[in-house]
Amino acid sequence: MKVKIKPEQFETIALLNEDKALELNANHELEVMAPTGGTAGRKNRRITQQLGIWTDNYGGESFDSSTIFLLPNGARRSPDASWISQSRWNALTPQQQDGFPPIAPDFVVELRSPSDDLSTLQAKMVEYISSGVSLGWLINPQDKQVEVYRQGREKEVLHQPRILDGEAVLPGFQLSLEKIYD
């Protein structure tokens, strides 16, 4: 069941329910995500840790799944991991940075957990790209498969990749999937 709410109501609901993973889709329907279990939480941490180390060395700002972004289509989304270039982040006001940043990240990662519906995550990835995200990875540990989404290109499906390359969006970033598949 999806409940329609006003965007301004979402911010209040999200702030009052910080212990819940909430998103608002472009149709202003509230989406409640299943809580993350230990295995998915451990895998998410490995992804955000690798991205965070790269960010500390090369710049920009990286975020974990608790950050909600206001996308251009009106959706409020919280990817499992994301990154924004420093120049784009600095273009936001301090108030925008403190709230739900009104910006599509340059890069996003969604990690499929056992309770996630694959087609729902795939639709979310398409939404990210249409909102301006340059590179997105949908990591599916169950099938040891990664779907790579890029601006202006068809989705690429990688079977059992060991390392993902950040390409021109994140030059030099390589995400090791070895412990993600465990």
Where are these regions (language model features)?
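Gly/Pro/Ser/Thr-rich low-complexity, intrinsically disordered segments predominantly at protein N-termini
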Residues: 1-182
